[in-house]
């Protein structure tokens, strides 16, 4: 992992823990300070943000720099790349689509993309794309696939490595196609649907796929092994698989929403709840 990916991964993982009790705010801050120092030193992380929920109250802690060159500190407004935590939003969109009757997880991919008829991937159920059990799709869409036409040609010609539903293999190409089809079922572009419908329904005003120009100053850099400032590379199905950017405040709210701690509209709350159903 380069540092931008590691920073997003570690930050997001820490978001998922909920502290149930603390003797005092000072004790809590000291515990978080210690953890932040440990992680930042061990992994050479330039900046981090923590969100913790105790008895329904959110606590935020910020460390280091979002931009080393400009010396911009991490704050509640800092926008981080979430990496593969983005997949939870793709799943939310799919669950929302199913609740609205435009998609069924037991449908096959070719129902939504007729071009894929009579191909292994076309005959694959959406639930298998969602659970990485579609027969061994690779981690990434190949680099030489540059547009939607080439993307569909790639899927049309792809051959399974092992039988569908026999193994799970983590794959951006699998969950990415799942997200793509979910938006297609609602006759919408994935990015547009996510930014105009799903994220507003979740009450996450500072979460984006495309960071707006007036928010770019808040957009944190990652740093590679050479110390160069970098951001996520664009690619096919990047929005669906790893393209979400968000703040600690929004992500702590998302965590609370998944635990049923904040009021949401019925459909979006049900979509979140459905995401936690196990498929075996």
Question: Which residues fall in each region the model found?
Answer:
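Bacterial N-terminal signal peptides
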Residues: 5-16
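Short, conserved catalytic-motif segment at the N-terminal edge
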Residues: 25-80, 102-107, 111, 147-159
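Active/ligand-binding-proximal structured segments within catalytic/core domains
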Residues: 90
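Short, surface-exposed loop or secondary-structure junction motifs
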Residues: 60-63, 67, 119-280
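Boundary at the C-terminal end of the N-terminal hydrophobic targeting segment
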Residues: 19-21
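Short, glycine/proline-biased beta-turn/loop segments that scaffold the active-site neighborhood
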Residues: 104-119, 201-202
């Amino acid at each position: 992992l380069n540092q931008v990916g590691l920073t997003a991964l570690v930050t997001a993982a820490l978001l998922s823990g909920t502290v149930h009790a603390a003797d005092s705010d000072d004790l809590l801050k000291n515990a978080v300070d210690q953890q932040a120092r440990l992680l930042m030193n061990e992994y050479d992380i330039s900046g981090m943000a923590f969100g913790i929920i105790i008895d329904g109250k959110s606590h935020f802690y910020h460390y280091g720099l979002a931009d080393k060159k400009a010396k911009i500190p991490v704050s509640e407004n800092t926008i981080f790349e979430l990496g593969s935590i983005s997949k939870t939003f793709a799943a939310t969109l799919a669950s929302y689509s199913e609740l609205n009757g435009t998609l069924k997880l037991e449908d096959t991919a070719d129902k939504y993309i007729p071009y894929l008829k009579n191909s292994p991937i076309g005959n694959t159920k959406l639930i298998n794309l969602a659970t990485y059990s579609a027969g061994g799709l690779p981690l990434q869409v190949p680099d030489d696939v540059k547009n939607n036409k080439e993307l569909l040609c790639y899927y049309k010609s792809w051959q399974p490595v092992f039988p569908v539903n026999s193994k799970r293999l983590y794959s951006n190409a699998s969950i990415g196609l799942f997200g793509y089809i979910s938006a297609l079922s609602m006759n919408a572009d994935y990015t547009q649907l996510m930014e105009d419908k799903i994220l507003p329904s979740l009450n996450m005003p500072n979460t984006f796929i495309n960071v707006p120009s007036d928010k770019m100053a808040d957009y944190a850099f990652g740093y590679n092994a050479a110390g160069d400032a970098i951001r996520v590379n664009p690619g096919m199905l990047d929005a669906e698989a790893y393209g979400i950017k968000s703040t600690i405040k929004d992500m702590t709210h998302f965590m609370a929403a998944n635990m049923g701690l904040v009021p949401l509209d019925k459909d979006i709350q049900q979509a979140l709840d459905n995401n936690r159903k196990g498929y075996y």
